[in-house]
Design a protein with these regions (language model features):
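Surface-exposed binding patches on compact interaction domains or structured appendages
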Residues: 702-712, 735-770
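Inhibitory N-terminal propeptides of secreted protease zymogens
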Residues: 39-184
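Short acidic, glycine-rich surface-loop motifs adjacent to enzyme active sites
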Residues: 319, 341-365, 388-389, 507-514
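Subtilisin-like serine protease catalytic core
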Residues: 78, 97, 204-333, 347-350, ...
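Structured lumen-facing ectodomains of secretory-pathway proteins
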Residues: 232-241, 246-252, 256-266, 283, ...
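Hydrolase catalytic cores
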Residues: 300-303, 320-326, 350, 515, ...
Length: 770
């Protein structure tokens, strides 16, 4: 038997047992800051054989860091750059977290107090002295930003040569090289026979009607590509205002927005009770309407929109809309995102939605960046940071020999920053709709990928095929009856010459292998030969993203190499279709894999992000897919849980509310199963699919010492002992003794059945014989 290669991060699906978990807060049923909890009675030990792992964690980290430095530091000394220059003094949020959180309920309250304003003034004086020094030495050309709320720093224009010199000054604490975050992109389509929970409206937006919470008394800041505030989804006004026009008037002068737009007035930034603040940090004006992007409007609609077409997750939440991507160039800059984050903190938001990022994110940005620390300060102040894991598939995607990794190098992690930062809750995507399947030869369940149109929208294979049939057959299908078709395996790669000895395929489905000619050409040749549909199977491992171009093609789909090889082993066979043949939904293939380079668990939670219908600029609606859509779905759930916690436990601090929200989410998530009925790896789904109902109705939740998330990160086994100790606690929220059953499911990466050289990105369950 060949040795199995075990990936360094294993699945620990813990359905917890606690023989006697007694409530420690019986009097008021409120969790304490440092609760006395009942730990699981015995530490669980799992022995792992790792003899086949060739690279140490240090070797892998060294290689990745070297590649990252080469990529990001490829500057000439004369190149103009933007850098954040930090000073030694505390920022407002640091002072709040360190000393003033006992006096002020939120960092916003402190920052807008007399004490906070005085501190901000002192910070500005120190920054002015530094600017004078830098200009006197000829090291900078322009000051972009003055930061005081979440970081004590200035953003300046300089050259890369001067950047290195600035970092050596005694008056400078550190320098941060500006990074560029990807302009959010949406993706169309997803498919993967097991039924997972579908708790969404027909739009794919999370259905929150099972609870009474609607988001009243909460505020969400959305950092994105632009917004159409006039859309009907934003016209229903909330029942309760946290931020009023008076609040905006009182603090506007202290906000970064005012520092860049001289004479900025309330009428410029206050849109409505629903949208109390808007500003474009990338282009330095109050016009947040996007130049050429529907992304931000779509995201905001998912979180809190409401009209006769869509219902958002938290319809009564207020939305602070912050445009951080420029109109005429790609990429959001670190300095603009920091400026928006500062103003979001000043406004006192509950949560910040960031459907943006760069793939293969690190725990800290290049050059010893302090950005991670900034996010940690925001988290410490009690604001929930909800971020997209990114749409980067796996690290093997797009490779010359397949879309998955070799078994000798199974590291598939592409999860992106800022979701890799400790403070950020990293969100993976599951489809918002179930997946159709076909039964091949009476026994094989066949999942497929839709082809895309020239506009990158998914085609609809089943409906296109059924609509091409006689009316009698159409009625049978729509009434739930089965339709069976014959398929014919075409030799070679589906070129004209390959049909020479096939015979008549009129009314049949052509099974064609990928390779040599285009997908469009394969489908057109099959059509000309009389086929009613075409199935293209991959010649390498992984899925096919298939565009059919502008031609009038027959219905065409793609399937995996493994499935296609089984079908092609027969010259002919049958394919049975039925309108009720639907399963899932399943994890989105585009959703980035973890872990982080330091073997941290990211993503941490899953939400619906595949084929989500929401608002777009101009009053319209569209279906988009991406972790960018999963993130607002999760963000809406987060603010509803925060509303629940604040109402049930009013004495908790903002920090306690944020921590408990994450722990409830991760403790009660539903484990997502793949088409084989096995759990997806936590490197793909995190804790599982978020459940609002479970979160607000659970009698207990899990905590882990030393971390504010309900997760166990085993990291590396440096001494190669093969033994991991895992300890966690159960917090009992009820007045009764709770008993749970404990089970542990260990799993590893399965190997492709077609060549045994590539991982299949599917789970293989471990047992005593493995």
């Amino acid at each position: 038997m060949k040795k199995k290669i075990l990936y360094g991060v294993i699945l620990l699906l813990l359905i917890i047992t606690c023989p006697s978990c007694k409530n420690k807060n019986k009097d008021n049923n409120v969790p304490s800051v440092d609760p006395v909890v009942t730990p699981i009675s015995n530490s669980q030990k799992l022995q792992i054989l790792k003899s086949d792992l060739k690279l140490t964690q240090e070797q892998v980290m060294s290689r990745i860091k070297a590649e990252n430095i080469k990529k990001n530091n490829g500057y000439l000394d004369t190149d103009e750059i933007i850098t954040m220059v930090t000073l030694d003094g505390e920022s407002l949020i640091e002072s709040y977290n360190n000393r003033y959180s006992v006096l002020y309920k939120t960092v916003s309250e402190y920052a807008n107090s007399a004490t906070g304003i005085k501190q901000a003034s002192k910070i500005k004086e120190e920054q002015d002295l530094l600017v004078e020094e830098l200009k006197g030495k000829g090291l900078i050309t322009e000051v972009e930003y003055y930061y005081s709320t979440i970081i004590n720093a200035i953003a300046v224009k300089t050259t890369y040569g001067n950047f290195k010199e600035i970092g050596n000054l005694a008056s400078v604490k550190s320098t941060i090289l500006s990074d560029t975050y990807n302009l959010p992109q949406s993706i169309s389509g997803d498919a993967s026979a097991i039924v997972n929970l579908v708790d969404v409206y027909e739009t794919g937006i999370f259905d929150s009607s099972s609870v009474s919470y609607k988001g009243a008394g909460t505020v969400v800041a959305v950092l994105d590509s632009g917004f159409d505030c006039t859309h009907t989804v934003f016209q229903k006004q909330p029942t309760e205002q946290v931020i009023t026009d008076r609040d905006i008037s009182s603090i506007l002068g202290n906000m970064n927005a005012s520092k860049f737009t001289k004479g900025l007035e309330l009428k410029d930034v206050y849109y409505s009770r629903k949208i109390p603040f808007v500003y474009d940090y990338a282009d330095k004006d109050s016009d947040v309407f996007p130049y050429d992007s529907e992304h931000g409007t779509h995201v905001a609609g998912i979180i809190g929109g409401l009209d006769d077409k869509i219902t958002g997750v938290a319809v009564d939440t207020q939305l602070v809309l912050m445009k951080v991507f420029p109109d005429l160039s790609e990429g959001g800059k670190t300095e603009d995102i920091l400026a928006a984050l500062e103003d979001a903190v000043l406004l006192g938001v509950d949560a910040i939605n960031m459907s943006l990022g760069s793939s293969c994110g690190f725990a800290r940005e290049e050059d010893g960046n302090k950005i991670n620390e900034v996010y940690e300060r925001i988290n410490e102040s009690g604001i929930s940071l909800i971020t997209a894991a990114s749409n980067s598939y796996s690290s093997g995607y797009g490779g010359e020999q397949g879309n998955t990794n070799f078994v000798t190098n199974p590291d598939s992690g592409t999860v992106g920053s800022p979701s890799t930062y400790d403070a950020a809750l990293s969100v993976a995507s599951i489809s918002g709709v179930k997946s159709r399947y076909i039964i091949a030869n009476g026994e094989q369940v066949l999942f497929y990928k839709e082809s895309n149109s020239v506009t990158a929208k998914p085609n609809d294979f089943m409906n296109e095929l059924v609509n091409s049939l006689p009316l009698e057959q159409q009625e049978k299908y729509r009434n739930g009856e089965k339709l069976t078709f014959e398929y014919v395996t075409i030799p070679g790669v589906g070129k004209e010459v390959n049909y020479a000895n096939v015979g008549d395929i009129t009314g049949k489905i052509a099974l064609v292998r990928r390779g040599d000619n285009s997908f469009e050409e394969k489908a057109m040749i099959a059509k000309n030969k009389g086929a009613i549909a075409c199935i293209i199977y991959n010649n390498i491992d992984g899925d096919i993203l298939m565009s059919m171009g502008k031609t009038e093609h027959i219905p065409t789909i793609s399937i995996s190499k493994d499935d296609g090889t089984i079908l092609a082993s027969k010259n002919t066979g049958t394919l049975t279709m039925r309108s009720t043949y639907q399963a899932g939904p399943f994890m989105s293939d585009f959703s980035s894999w973890g872990p982080t380079p330091s073997l941290g668990i990211k993503p941490e939670i899953t939400a619906h992000g595949g084929e989500i219908m929401s608002a777009i600029p101009g009053g319209g609606y569209d279906k988009l897919s991406g972790t960018s859509m999963a993130t607002p779905n999760l963000c809406g759930i987060v603010v509803l849980i925060r509303q629940y916690i604040k109402e049930k436990y009013p004495t908790l601090s903002a920090k306690q509310v944020a921590v408990m929200t994450n722990q409830l989410l991760m403790s009660t998530a539903n484990i997502v199963l793949d088409e084989r009925g096995n759990p997806y790896s936590p490197r793909k789904q995190g804790a599982g699919l978020a459940s609002l109902y479970n979160s607000v109705n659970t009698k207990a939740y899990i905590t882990v010492d030393g971390i504010d998330r309900s997760k166990l990160e085993l990291k590396d086994d440096a001494k190669r002992t093969g033994i991991y100790n895992m300890e966690f606690n159960l917090i009992n929220l009820s007045n009764e003794t709770l008993t749970y059953d404990l089970s542990v499911v260990g799993m590893t990466e399965s190997v492709s059945t077609s060549d045994e050289k590539h991982v299949a990105e599917k789970s293989q369950i471990l047992n005593g014989n493995t």
